Amino acid sequence: MRIFRGYRHRDLVEPCALTIGNFDGVHRGHQAMLALLRSEAQHRGLPVRVMTFEPHPREYFAPDRAPARISSLRDKLTELARCGVDEVVVLPFRAALAQQSAEDFIGDILLEGLQVRYVLVGDDFRFGAGRRGDYAMLDEAGGAMGFDVARMNSYEVHGLRVSSSAVRGALSEGRMRDAADLLGRPYSISGHVVHGRKLGRELGASSPAAGDGFRTLNLRFSHPQPAASGIFVVQVHGLTAAPLAGVANLGVRPSLDPADVNRGQVLLESHVLDWPADLAVEGGYGKIARVDLLHKLHDELKYDGLPALTRGIAQDCEDARAWFASRHSQTRRQTTRDRI
């Protein structure tokens, strides 16, 4: 999949089938739209192109009221590639784009910049300054300028409309199974493993210098307001052949010293329950990991001192092991029933 920053690019000369949106989370509704776009593009012999925005337009207009982020740009692009998208155009959402008229958006960006021949949009799609452009305007312009326009109605699961807002609601309330149902996969965060304070390896260590305590794999979340936060049962992918069971903290770590320079930064800190020997030595630093958040244990807590924090982490690890054991037992019972 090719990625372009902006629409004025010498390699964006081929006519395309296009859809436009924020695609936060790339949920099942997005996936259905992309499948429809891919089918139409194949029929017409066109590449599948997606135009998205960074930052989210609502972060530009009202940063204090902007929605929490489900996925980073990295994770969004990864999921778009999995959906068979050929090209993604990432438009920086700045003043010029915010003030552009709907007519100029069609003429300058869609026609001149992206060479559209077919455009698929959602039933609530709006564009241009003041959100004046809609499906009817786009369809009329297509008839006059030589490109086809179609729209897709809302996608529903169990009678409920699938949307990024619904995913955010499930994540904010810790309903991870509901979020996975809407996403079509477990909610996950990926990124490079980065160095932290290395405080975790001291907590619960067998001796002050042993470094065998609750060491963590740390990933930065690029947005200050993630859709989920708290303590989670997780699986870590990408560092070993098999996924690693663990427990993770996603948030700002309120138990850190107020003077700590890292306090307030959003991190995903994952403690692997059973560290492989090679990973325990080299720590996975610099590698890309994907962490699936499977079950929420509780919100972030502020502990009164390191001994209390150590006891809290130990309890979280025990609860995570119990959750995995319960899931394994349920899977085994289901397998037995299927064989009968």
Name each model feature, range by range.
Residues 57-63, 161-162, 301-302:
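A short acidic, helix-capping loop that chelates divalent metal ions and anchors anionic groups
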Residues 96-214, 304-317, 322, 328, ...:
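Classical nucleotidyltransferase
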Residues 72-88:
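A glycine-rich helix N-cap at a beta->alpha junction
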Residues 68-76, 100-106:
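Glycine-rich, highly charged phosphate/nucleotide-binding loops
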Residues 197-340:
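Phosphate/ribose-recognition catalytic cores of enzymes acting on nucleotide-derived substrates
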Residues 7-72:
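N-terminal catalytic cores of NTP/NDP-binding nucleotidyl/phosphoryl-transfer enzymes
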